[in-house]
Amino acid sequence: MRNTDKRWDMIFMSHTLEHIVNPCDFVRKCEKMNTRYFFIEVPTFDYKLSNEPFGMFCEEHVNMFTLESLQNLMNECGYQLVSADFNINVTSKLPAGSPAMKTIWEKPFKKKYQFINNSKNILCEYINDSENLLAEVRKRIAEIDEKKKLAIWGTGHHVSMLLANTDLLDKNIVKVYDSDRRKYGQKLNGCEIGAFSENDIIQGNVQAILLATYTAQDALEKILETYQNKVEVIKLY
């Protein structure tokens, strides 16, 4: 962080702290430039949807916070909590950024407020629910006929998780689709990544399509409605 003699009444930090390797050291450096208030917005682990893919909250994040853990951090750095609001959008399907909490902190630290929630219990419950969901996903993939010509639609970190934790590699993968043109020409499991082509279905080159994405699953399913009698569409969630 650049040295400066300037000081601000409020520091505003939105969806930043989860990317910082040493958040305590970072906040302490910010504190030297701050006279009173600190606004922090981060994804929260206090509320997680257990029907999300296992661990998909971790996209480029090196830290995950509950209000309890964030309070411990900010108290250590000389701040006390003024207010906290939780934004829970159950239809967003963006595990990496939602739900989120918006908090305001004030210095100097005077009193710590004790919350009933327990971060360890929340984490254990999340792991238990997610392992149950992953077992269902494994079962669905195991049921895919190994003789069928399978296309995978989606090449993000979610499909990497599937390749590592299921027997997807044992299937007859012949095509890989993605909507991101920047990935075209690259390979996944020996197949070149490209755009979806209806000719693959019409010509019989693809017999089943696995929707290997959580955030875009509904949108892709709608695209494939036209071909529902010609190709098997496999959803995981």
Summary of predicted features, one role per range:
Residues 39-41, 83, 151-152, 235:
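A structural signal for short, well-ordered beta-strand segments and their strand-loop junctions
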Residues 78-80, 231-232:
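Charged, glycine-enriched surface loops/patches
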Residues 88-93, 104:
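N-terminal juxtadomain amphipathic helix
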Residues 97-237:
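Hydrophobic, well-ordered beta-alpha structural blocks that scaffold small-molecule cofactor pockets
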Residues 1-55, 59-79, 105, 177-184, ...:
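Conserved SAM-binding loop
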Residues 47-48, 91, 160:
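Generic structural signal for helix capping and beta-alpha/helix-loop junctions
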Residues 79-90:
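Conserved S-adenosyl-L-methionine
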